[in-house]
């Protein structure tokens, strides 16, 4: 685990050095969490997208494609719940002026406890040698059990608080755990507030008459609103699927992890419509089919 950040830095360096990914607008100091796919990166991305499209659409008689617009009527996002619920719980540190996702701070706290569990296991492995039984040790060692109970308790409370939109309790949990700013060590926190992840824009000739729109945060809604159009014009019978690839946008405040969490990204998505009562059958089918596809890319 200690080598993971260094390995990740090497991957990022390699991606830039060999023309796969560049920082967007780099000559103007760049733009956080926005990247350009370079000469080799775009070819790799194009190959994966075309391979995906052939496997998902062209090789299946009951799956068709769609290219929905990025702009959609704002009621779409109200009906889908994105306007009211597509949020991240954010908290600011008053001293460092840095903003964090409250749930990530708590998850990082739990990750540190996981590290303590790993250390206990390694110590026991070294002590007992070949006779060491990892599963038995984890289920019987009082310290490990205590650590596990702590993690379960913290994550359970956080989950319930977020589900109930009790942001005061999320802050209380951070304070009770004495979670500090990762940069300064300060524990001087603001209240937790919900921040909507959709980018807003305007449609119209003037500011007064312009309609408020959003850059789509996902491609799925374009499929859902076109369901009847596709079904009627394509004479599709359930079960059938609609696939789409395209840009999506999310205003990630705490963006990190290189191209794995970007503000502008591309999705490849299939929505498969089935008859009630056949969920398990189709879930197993697609789980196996998609796993085989990913393994065919050498991801095993």
Residue spans of the language-model regions?
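TRNA-recognition modules of translation machinery and tRNA-sensing kinases, especially anticodon-binding
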Residues: 2-300
């Amino acid at each position: 685990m200690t080598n993971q950040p260094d390995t990740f830095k090497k991957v990022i360096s390699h991606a830039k050095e060999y023309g796969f990914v560049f920082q967007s607008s780099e000559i103007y100091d760049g733009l956080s969490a926005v990247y350009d796919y370079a000469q080799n990166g775009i070819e790799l991305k194009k190959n994966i997208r075309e391979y995906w499209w052939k496997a998902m659409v062209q090789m299946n008689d009951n799956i068709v494609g769609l290219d929905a617009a990025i702009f959609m009527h704002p009621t779409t996002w109200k009906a889908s719940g994105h306007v009211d619920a597509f949020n991240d719980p954010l908290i600011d540190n008053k001293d460092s002026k840095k903003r964090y996702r409250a749930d990530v701070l708590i998850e990082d706290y739990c990750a540190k406890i996981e590290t303590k569990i790993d250390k206990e296991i390694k110590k026991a492995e070294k002590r007992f040698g070949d006779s060491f039984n990892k599963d038995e040790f984890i289920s019987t060692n009082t310290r490990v059990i205590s650590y596990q109970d702590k993690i379960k308790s913290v994550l359970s409370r956080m989950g319930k608080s977020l589900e109930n939109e009790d942001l005061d309790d999320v802050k209380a949990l951070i304070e009770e755990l004495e979670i500090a700013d990762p940069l300064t060590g300060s524990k001087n926190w603001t209240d937790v507030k919900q921040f909507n992840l959709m980018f807003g824009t305007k449609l119209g000739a003037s500011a007064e008459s312009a309609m408020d729109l959003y850059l789509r945060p996902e491609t799925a809604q374009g499929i859902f609103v076109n369901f009847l159009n596709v079904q009627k014009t394509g004479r599709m019978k359930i079960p059938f699927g609609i696939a789409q690839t395209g840009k999506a946008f999310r205003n990630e405040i705490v963006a990190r992890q290189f191209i794995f969490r970007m503000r502008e990204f591309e999705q490849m998505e299939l929505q498969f419509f089935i008859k009630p009562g056949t969920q398990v059958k189709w879930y197993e089918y697609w789980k196996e089919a998609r796993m085989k596809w990913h393994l065919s890319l050498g991801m095993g």
